[in-house]
Amino acid sequence: MDILGTLQKLSMESGFAAFFVTDGGWKNLIMIIIAFVLLYLGIVKKFEPLLLCGIAFGCLLTNLSYFIGMGENALYHPELWEAFLDEASPYYHSYGHVMSNAGLLDFFYIGVKAGIYPSLIFLGVGAMTDFGPLLANPKSLLLGASAQLGVFVAFLGAIALGFTGPEGASIGIIGGADGPTAIFLTTKLAPHLLGPIAIAAYSYMALIPLIQPPLMKLCTTKEMREVKMEQAREVSKAEKIIFPIVVATFVILLLPSTAPLVGCLMLGNLFRECGVTDRLSDTAQNALMNIVTIFLATSVGATMVAQNFLSGATIKIIILGLCAFAISTIGGLLGGVVMYYASGKKINPLIGSAGVSAVPMAARVSQDVGRKYNKTNFLLMHAMGPNVAGVIGSAIAAGFLLSVFGG
C-alpha cells in the first residue's frame, strides 16, 4: 500500500486544494470570506439577521460545494438555471430537468423562481399589518406613492450605466425598501443579479436609522419638524374587513401582474381582520413566515456564485441601490412638505420618509426624529399610514415594471 500516494491523492481531492488548483477557485475563496462578513453583520451587528444569516450561509454552502470537485453532487447548479432560462436550450423552462439533476439548494430555489416564497412572505406581512392608520388618513397613500420616486430614478440611472431594461427595473425596485418585492421582480426579470440586489435591499433596510435622518433634516425646516399632528380618527371593524377585498379587486384588475404579491398581502390581512380565522392569521404571522424565511434566505444566498457576484455590475448595483433608497426617502419627504402646506401646516412632513415600505422601521425613524424636535410629539401611528401604503406602492411599482419588461 502506497501511503504517501494515498495521502497525496486525498490532499489533491480536498476542497482546500481545489481553491488553488481549480480554475477560478480563488474567486470562491473570496465569496466564502464575503459570507463570513455577512454572517458577522447579521449576528454581531444585527443587520436584518433573520434574512442576512440565511443568505450568508446559503452563499457559504454554494461556494463550498460547487467548486471543490463535487460535480453532480453540488448543492446548487447554476448551469441548470442557465439552461432553464435559455430559449435556445431544449431544457428551457423545464422544471423536470432541474429536478432530475438538482442539489438540495436547487430544490429550495424552485420556490424563489416560481415566485412562491415572496408571495408567502407577503401573506405573513399582510397578517401582521394593521392598515388602520392608512384608513384613518387616506391621504397617506400619496406619501406611499411619492416614496416610489427612487425606483424610477434608479431605473433611469441603471439604463445610463449600461444595464438592460429588465436589469434596470430590478435594480430600481431596491428603492422600494421591500426585500421580498425586490426578490420577486429580480427573479422574473434578471435572476443573475439576484444575489447583489437582495444583499443591497436588505442592507439598506437595516441602515434606515443611519440613512434617513440626515435626509429628513435636509428636506424640512425646524418649524416643519416640530408640527404636532392631531390624533387620527378611529377606524371601524367593517372598514378593516372591506379594505383588503376592495384593494385586491381594484389593484389586480388594474395591474394583473401584481396578483401574487397584492393578492397574498390582502389575503393575509383579511385573515387578520375578519375575526373568524385567528388560527390562520397566527400561522401566517409566525410558523409559516419563519419557515418560508429560512427557505427564501438560503436559496437567495445560493445564487451568490463567484462568476455572478464578483463583477463590476455588483458595485454599480450597490451604488444605485443606495441612490434609489435615498431618492425614495427624499420623494416621500417632498410629498410630506407639499401636504404640510396643503393642510395649512397641520401635517408633519417627517411622516413622508416612512413612505418606503420597510415596516415598521421607517415609521419608528419618523417617530424618533420628531420627538427630538418636539418632546410631546407622537408621530408613530401617523407615520404607519404612509409606511403600509409603501408596501402596497412597492408591489404596484413592481407589477408595473413586470408588465413593461416581463414580455
Give names to the regions the model predicted:
Residues 1-78, 100:
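N-terminal alpha-helical transmembrane segments of multi-pass membrane transport
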Residues 110-115, 122-128, 143-153, 157, ...:
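Alpha-helical membrane segments and immediately flanking helix-loop junctions
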Residues 134-155, 306-332, 383-387:
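Entry/N-cap segments of selected transmembrane alpha helices
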